[in-house]
Amino acid sequence: MHAEFRTDRGRIRHHNEDNGGVFENKDNQPIVIVADGMGGHRAGDVASEMAVRLLSDAWKETTALLTAEEIETWLQKTIQEVNKEIVLYSESEMDLNGMGTTLVAAIMAQSQVVIANVGDSRGYLLQNHVLRQLTEDHSLVHELLRTGEISKEDAMNHPRKNILLRALGVEGKVEVDTFVVPFQTSDTLLLCSDGLTNMVPETEMEEILKSKRTLSEKADVFITKANSYGGEDNITVLLVERDLTQKGRDAS
């Protein structure tokens, strides 16, 4: 597996409240994670850092999970535990009350990948030269779009675009979506925060992923492109291919 992680403050925000990285368990099986924090006074930074640290620390203590079913069970259970820890910590510190974070994570299982998500950080897969979104945004605007109350054009500039219906750290229990999809040698997995998807159209994202650039160059281009369109939020990108082997690493 070859992975490239990038995170950038963007052109407007003073702090980077995104977090993420690539982490391995005891059998060198990787998990890839992106989290986008929310809350004032750097609380979002605390929430996203906690989510990534707690989930990756739990993963580092496991041995290889070989089936998609095992991985789904582990993700559901562990993300609930992570959520409870964030809630408890936010309740213990006045400055952190109301903090929360999105989360999207992926674990490889033989010829498949298992993805878990909460919030509006997304997972995409480029397969057979076609980019498709795997995750569903847990946001007010997505719900209005899904029910036909607004158009796709309305959604792009909706005043309540940042309202989430699900996030880690908000309530004692959180609903986690999980997906199992085929992941072949020629495929590319993209995990990202909304600082990318709110800035760069999916048609351009697809063209970048289909290009002849290296995976590292593609990750850099995503950051540059989002900033060139305004860089209104923190931008985080994690790209994964399975045809190369690279030692896992973490970043924040």
From Swiss-Prot:
PROSITE patterns: PPM_2
SUPFAM superfamilies named among the record's database cross-references: PP2C-like (SSF81606)
Membrane topology: Peripheral membrane protein
Compartments in which it is found: Cytoplasm; Membrane
Record keyword Manganese present: yes
Domain PPM-type phosphatase residues, every copy: 2-242
Cofactor note: Binds 2 manganese ions per subunit.
Record's GO cellular component terms: cytoplasm; membrane
Required co-factors: Mn(2+)
Class of enzymatic activity (EC top level): hydrolase
Keywords: Cytoplasm, Hydrolase, Manganese, Membrane, Metal-binding, Protein phosphatase
Name of a matching Pfam family: PP2C_2
Family statement drawn from the similarity comment of this UniProt entry: Belongs to the PP2C family.
Alphabetical list of NCBIfam families matching this protein: Stp1_PP2C_phos
Protein name as it appears in the record: Serine/threonine phosphatase stp
Organism per entry: Listeria monocytogenes serotype 4b (strain F2365)
Gene: stp
